[in-house]
Amino acid sequence: MLFAAVVFSSGFRAQAQDPPPGGFKNALLTLGKSGKVALTYTLWDQQVGKGTYTLAFFWASWSDEAREELPYIQAIQKKYAGKVKVLGVTYGDEIQDSMDAMVELGMTFPHFVFVEDAEPDGRFDIDSIPLTILFGPDGKIIARDMKGEEIEKAVEEALR
């Protein structure tokens, strides 16, 4: 089940509302420069495999290891802007906790929110987080299970 929340900002704490009719399927959360979290609706396949490389970072607010990996992901976002799209995927987390962490950690890349250990179509074989997957312009997986500096090495190799 793909799930996210309608979000508004109150100070620095993002707040979720009740789901709109039809639920939160295909919702994408983005932290703006103002510190507010915005909601749009899009399909996973509209974000991945559209002629650009995509780095998907599966994480949860409670994962210390995911927080340790975040600087590597943010460095890719900054260094390869326009060449590599970075998507966060909160996984197995409470929605409010995910939104709070996005604000706290300054995660400005868009996020899909998966709850109840659901994943899109079961296609990624997620057995632990954090998990980083690099997709090619065709949407096929190029590399996965990268950590730390391995992430940038995989991106550099793919862009050659």
What would you call each of these model-derived segments?
Residues 82-97, 107-117:
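Thiol-based oxidoreductase modules, predominantly thioredoxin-like and allied folds used
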Residues 60-64, 91-96, 117-119, 140, ...:
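Solvent-exposed loop/turn segments at secondary-structure junctions
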Residues 55-56, 86, 132:
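Hydrophobic beta-strand anchors of alpha/beta hydrolase catalytic cores
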Residues 26-54:
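A short beta-strand-turn-helix
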Residues 51-54, 58-62, 128:
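Short pre-active-site segment immediately N-terminal to redox-active cysteine/selenocysteine motifs
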Residues 1-36, 143:
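N-terminal targeting signals for export/organelle localization
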Residues 103-108, 114-158:
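Thiol/disulfide oxidoreductase modules built on the thioredoxin-like
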